[in-house]
Amino acid sequence: MQRSPQFVDGQFRNPVPTRQMVPGAALAMARTQLSREGRLRRSPVGRIPVHRPTAADWGEPPASGLRLTWMGHSSVLAEIDGHRVLFDPVWGERCSPFTWAGPRRLHPVPLALGELDPVDAVVISHDHYDHLDMPTVKALIRTGTRFVVPLGIGADLELWGVPAERITELDWHESAAVGELTLTATPAQHFCGRGLRGPQHTLWASWVVAGPANRVFHSGDTGYFPGFAEIGAEHGPFDATMIQIGAYSEFWPDIHMTPEEGLRAHADLSQGSPAGALLPIHWGTFNLAPHAWSDPVERTVAAAREAGAKVAAPLPGKPFEPADEQIVDPWWRSVALPPTHGWPSWPAVTPSADAFEVVR
């Protein structure tokens, strides 16, 4: 770790000063938590529908060579050019160090982990409990898969029983080969922290996975920063981006993106090309922020349509091919508390390269 340019004075750091929380946020958050209507809107009012993948979904290879299945939160199975990569798998009931306290899952996992066919690699973005789940990792050990993680996280995996030879740790801008795929750790603007361990002792990252014909980007958790354009210039364009658009707040603007910032990141990564699909992640599964439960996806779809960007918003567990036309069905509206003035209409805009501009 000491060799990393990100490791300074005994800690991993972002290139620019990054606030985990703005001054005075604790008191303001307490007031927000006391709002009855706010509490109601932060959770669904009905049972979240989930698609259980079947052989009909996964039985044949994707025609385009790329298929994504959002399992909820930031967990995504990417089938890319004949390989299977599982990002940030969290199958646990809570994202917490405790089984009896902490944010609880709002919908069941689409598929039991034991029913998931083996994957070629598990990729972890950082060590927070909603991205690195110990019971899930322990279950995946039995499959013989390889774990590709940022610097420092390998120690946790070894402690949990993952053989050292199946762990690959990477710094930003370093790559590893998995079959015909190249996995590259890329920058993110976030932080780490787990249990009672000292601060910033593991790195956080976004990820690029490139195959012979397709390439994807997974943001992990991050604030909006100029690095997206640099990643796009070096590794893009992408056939799909998986972008964090939930758990944002005015109380921590540096470490989580709003939906509109998520779209800006997608535009930067795409270098002005509207062809790649945006899959919103980090929403819907756990209640982690003061915003309404459905706001992240509502705002993302609205912003994407206005910009002429291709966006997918599938049910948890519903596979899709980013190359296909994406027809968004607002399934979440059936289980969310409607806004005071009703559900808004989305802009009906046809995607075009002219409408989709890189935001600087």
Where are these regions (language model features)?
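Active-site-proximal loop/helix segment associated with metal-binding centers of metalloenzymes
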Residues: 91, 185-211, 331-360
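Active-site metal-binding motif and surrounding structural segment of the metallo-beta-lactamase
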Residues: 100-148, 236-242
